[in-house]
């Protein structure tokens, strides 16, 4: 069965894995998911990820991160959804928790955090917010 929102599925797997105190979670692989995981790893919200083969499908094993027993991610939410896309210019990109969190943005220059998008002066689709 095809997923209507693969990115939403990835975020839910990460959120559920952290609530269950898992060390890692597995998700089907896609280019968008890999790029979002790159941003999360670069910003320090996950330890990293590895690409693996499960049967005849590509998968991603995501290593979750904890700090003093608490999940590194307190809030992980999809902003732009398949039924309602949200776009923002570089100057209007939302700040999460007054800059303590990040917004993940899909831009013409790739998937970036809000700070990287502002530095490169590009806007795009606001995919998710994390803190």
UniProtKB/Swiss-Prot annotation:
Coiled-coil intervals, chain numbering: none
InterPro entries: Ribosomal_uS8, Ribosomal_uS8_CS, Ribosomal_uS8_sf
Gene Ontology terms describing biological process: translation
Sample GO molecular function, one term: structural constituent of ribosome
Keywords noted in UniProt: Ribonucleoprotein, Ribosomal protein, RNA-binding, rRNA-binding
PROSITE patterns noted in UniProt: RIBOSOMAL_S8
Record's GO cellular component terms: ribonucleoprotein complex; ribosome
Domain of life: Bacteria
Similarity annotation: Belongs to the universal ribosomal protein uS8 family.
Job description of the protein: One of the primary rRNA binding proteins, it binds directly to 16S rRNA central domain where it helps coordinate assembly of the platform of the 30S subunit.
Subunit structure: Part of the 30S ribosomal subunit. Contacts proteins S5 and S12.
PANTHER family, per the entry: 40S RIBOSOMAL PROTEIN S15A (PTHR11758)
Name of the protein: Small ribosomal subunit protein uS8
Organism for this UniProt entry: Zymomonas mobilis subsp. mobilis (strain ATCC 31821 / ZM4 / CP4)
Gene name in the database record: rpsH
């Amino acid at each position: 069965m095809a997923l209507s929102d693969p990115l939403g599925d990835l975020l839910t797997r990460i959120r559920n894995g952290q609530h269950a105190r898992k060390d890692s979670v597995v998700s089907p692989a896609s280019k968008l998911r890999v790029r979002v995981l790159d941003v999360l790893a670069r910003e320090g919200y996950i330890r990293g990820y590895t690409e693996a083969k499960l049967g005849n499908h590509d998968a991603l094993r995501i290593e979750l991160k904890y700090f003093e027993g608490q999940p590194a991610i307190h809030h992980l939410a999809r902003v732009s959804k398949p039924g309602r896309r949200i776009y923002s210019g570089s100057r209007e990109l939302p700040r999460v928790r007054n800059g303590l969190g990040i917004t993940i943005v899909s831009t013409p220059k790739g998937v970036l955090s809000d700070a990287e998008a502002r530095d490169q002066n590009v806007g795009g689709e606001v995919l998710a917010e994390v803190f």
